[in-house]
């Protein structure tokens, strides 16, 4: 039983542990991990910076210290190894809300009613561009001011204010309006990390001979379009939109999906998105 939820359990432990570390740093001064998801320090020494936030600051004309740039470099290298959108499924607190909405959509059969996604996944890339333009003209990191991720994160650490409202809006939007609406279509941070994810080393790999076409993987996957190869051919998931959440691996009873290291010599396959 646990095997079918091993990655889900690991993700929840990771997400909650990170929030707890931020909380105890703020309340008790135990500075194992201090700051927030945009800028943090590990043991008051190692800087970590959100590269997307840093880019907004750059366009806003802010001075970027060496520590900030070094922190962004650390984060980029990390997610180029484990998968850019691993942030979305393993770190971001909003993922717990959207996962619940997606679970209820499956239970209530909403996905069968809305089989075709009515919105483009490219919206988030437009949001990225717009955030850079607004940051340039306003002189501040535009998305950070209105980010539901920041609202929820600050709410968990300092007490919910608008955090509750942000959580409720995202939950209802994903449940009733659009599957994976926030994370998969609108969130610019998810869009940014999907670009980083194109270079990631750790990938989900499909082994076609083992596949019995049960389609459980596509049913649970928040980004099911990345599993276009299922039942067709053996190959890794090449799309940066994969969150490496591991749900497809967990539910596959045929051992047709597993995590593997990207084959650096074989990257000429055309990606179908």
PLM ranges: what are they?
Residues 1-235, 240-243, 250-273:
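Non-ligating segments of multi-cofactor redox enzymes
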């Amino acid at each position: 039983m646990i095997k079918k939820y091993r990655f889900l359990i690991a993700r929840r432990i990771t997400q909650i542990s990170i929030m707890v570390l931020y909380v105890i740093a703020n309340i008790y001064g135990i500075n194992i991990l201090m700051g927030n998801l945009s800028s943090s320090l590990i043991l008051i020494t190692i800087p970590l910076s959100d590269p997307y936030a840093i880019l907004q600051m750059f366009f806003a004309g802010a001075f970027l210290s060496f520590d900030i740039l070094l922190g962004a470099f650390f984060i980029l290298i990390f997610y180029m190894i484990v998968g850019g959108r691993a942030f979305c499924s393993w770190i971001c607190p909003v993922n717990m809300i959207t996962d619940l909405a997606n679970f209820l959509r499956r239970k209530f059969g909403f996905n069968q009613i809305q089989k075709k996604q009515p919105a483009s996944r490219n919206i988030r890339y437009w949001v990225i561009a717009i955030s850079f333009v607004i940051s340039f003209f306003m002189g501040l990191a535009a998305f950070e001011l209105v980010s539901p991720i920041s609202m929820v994160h600050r709410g968990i650490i300092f007490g919910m204010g608008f955090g509750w409202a942000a959580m409720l809006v995202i939950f209802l939007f994903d449940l009733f309006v659009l599957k994976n609406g926030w994370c998969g279509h609108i969130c610019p941070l998810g869009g940014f990390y999907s670009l980083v994810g194109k270079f990631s080393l750790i990938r989900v790999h499909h082994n076609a001979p083992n596949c019995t076409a049960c389609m459980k993987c596509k049913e649970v996957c928040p980004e099911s379009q990345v599993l276009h190869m299922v039942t067709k051919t053996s190959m890794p998931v090449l799309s940066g939109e994969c969150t490496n959440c591991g749900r497809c691996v967990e539910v596959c009873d045929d051992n047709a999906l597993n995590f593997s290291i990207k084959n650096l010599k074989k990257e000429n396959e055309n990606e179908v998105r």
